């Protein structure tokens, strides 16, 4: 049994980049294909990211950010309100010398993006982080493969790389978006993952590490959904939900404005509760009428003898993902937006796997 103390903290960044190949207004998301040898969701297409390392919160970063950016916020602005933790979930007391979570998790996401995809979300140390337009990734340095190997072996080397390039992690380009806790189920490795979003003017060059990551695609939200339905890629429910949420935005500029206008709102972190029906699975999310915020559901599921269709028809207040099969998900949403965020629109699939919004 995996109690709260065994959960691993992680960060992931949804990279949305301008796409001039078809439409100047559109954007594409970077999805990395995980190796089949990975223990956690092998073969899935995911956003770049990984587990928080002690090196990400090391006070040694303070010297690199100085003198332009100083503790405790390093220019990120006022701290957003903290969401009450899920009952029974705690990570213990933080090291008082460590960087704040907001900073450390951003460094983690940036480091992992470099390790997995070879993309450097860095900014020259003397650059002003204030910007009215999306950021740009740094051109890959000479000796990319050697540096990446060093960082993979020892995350502390990422600080050395940044110092070598006279850059800092571009923490200001990463916006709070939300977060997901791995639900109780067959997956024994569970993560407390912060989701961040970064808008880039152009698609950077991507070089998969060919270890954890064996391929990648730049896809719009609608293209990613179509590829999932046609079994070209596989998405875990959180990635599917977030991709459908991003489908609310018609352009990169609209997405960037949205993120820039809500910096003080922060992001909600959700623990899905799994409801096992007689013929399927439903992931219940906060706000749904069947959702129960109780520590018991850190280590158990709900179950019913009813069919999925019955449960769906009975519902009035909904925030749920219905899992019909590994490649057929539906989203049911009736909640108004909160915290100046957006929810995905209803997404229903007919028997021929044609989606209806």
From Swiss-Prot:
It catalyses: an acyl-CoA + H2O = an acyl-4'-phosphopantetheine + adenosine 3',5'-bisphosphate + 2 H(+); CoA + H2O = (R)-4'-phosphopantetheine + adenosine 3',5'-bisphosphate + 2 H(+); hexanoyl-CoA + H2O = hexanoyl-4'-phosphopantetheine + adenosine 3',5'-bisphosphate + 2 H(+); octanoyl-CoA + H2O = S-octanoyl-4'-phosphopantetheine + adenosine 3',5'-bisphosphate + 2 H(+). Residues 10-242 form the Nudix hydrolase domain. Mg(2+) binds at residues 112, 116. The keyword Cytoplasm does not apply. The modification N6-succinyllysine is found at residue 300. The record marks 34, 40, 189 as: Important for coenzyme A binding. Its main location: other. GO terms for molecular function: coenzyme A diphosphatase activity; magnesium ion binding. A motif (Microbody targeting signal) lies at residues 355-357. Monomer. PANTHER family: ACYL-COENZYME A DIPHOSPHATASE NUDT19 (PTHR12318:SF0), TESTOSTERONE-REGULATED PROTEIN RP2 (PTHR12318). Belongs to the Nudix hydrolase family. This is Acyl-coenzyme A diphosphatase NUDT19.
């Amino acid at each position: 049994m995996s109690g709260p103390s065994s959960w691993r903290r992680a960060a992931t960044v949804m990279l949305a980049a301008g796409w001039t190949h078809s439409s100047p207004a559109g954007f594409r998301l970077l999805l990395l294909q995980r190796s089949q040898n990975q223990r956690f969701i092998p073969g899935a297409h995911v956003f770049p990211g990984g587990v928080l390392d002690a090196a990400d919160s090391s006070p040694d970063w303070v010297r690199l950010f100085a003198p332009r950016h100083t503790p405790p916020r390093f220019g990120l602005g006022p701290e957003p309100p903290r969401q009450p933790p899920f009952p029974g979930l705690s990570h213990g007391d933080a090291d008082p010398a460590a960087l704040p979570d907001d900073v450390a998790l951003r460094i983690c996401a940036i480091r992992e993006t470099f390790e997995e995809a070879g993309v450097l979300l860095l900014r020259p140390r003397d650059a002003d982080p204030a910007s009215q337009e999306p950021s740009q990734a740094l051109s890959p340095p000479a000796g990319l493969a050697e540096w990446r190997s060093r960082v993979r072996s020892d995350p502390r080397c990422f600080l050395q790389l940044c110092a070598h390039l006279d850059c800092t992690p571009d923490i200001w380009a990463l916006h709070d978006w939300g977060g997901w806790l791995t639900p109780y189920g067959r997956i024994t490795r569970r993560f407390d993952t912060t989701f961040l979003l970064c808008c880039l003017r152009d698609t950077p060059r991507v070089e998969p590490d060919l270890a954890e990551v064996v391929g990648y695609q730049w896809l719009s939200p609608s293209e990613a959904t179509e590829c999932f339905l046609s079994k070209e890629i596989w998405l875990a429910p959180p990635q599917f939900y977030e991709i459908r949420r991003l489908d609310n935005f018609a352009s990169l500029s609209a997405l960037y404005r949205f993120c820039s206008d809500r910096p003080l709102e922060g992001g909600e972190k959700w623990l899905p509760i799994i409801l096992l029906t007689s013929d399927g699975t439903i992931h219940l999310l906060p706000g749904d009428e069947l959702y129960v915020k109780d520590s018991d559901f850190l280590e158990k599921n709900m179950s019913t003898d009813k069919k999925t269709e019955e449960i769906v028809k009975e519902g009035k207040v909904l925030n749920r993902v219905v899992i019909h099969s590994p490649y057929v998900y539906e989203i049911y949403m009736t909640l108004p937006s909160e915290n100046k965020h957006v929810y995905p629109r209803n997404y229903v699939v007919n028997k021929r796997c044609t989606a209806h919004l």
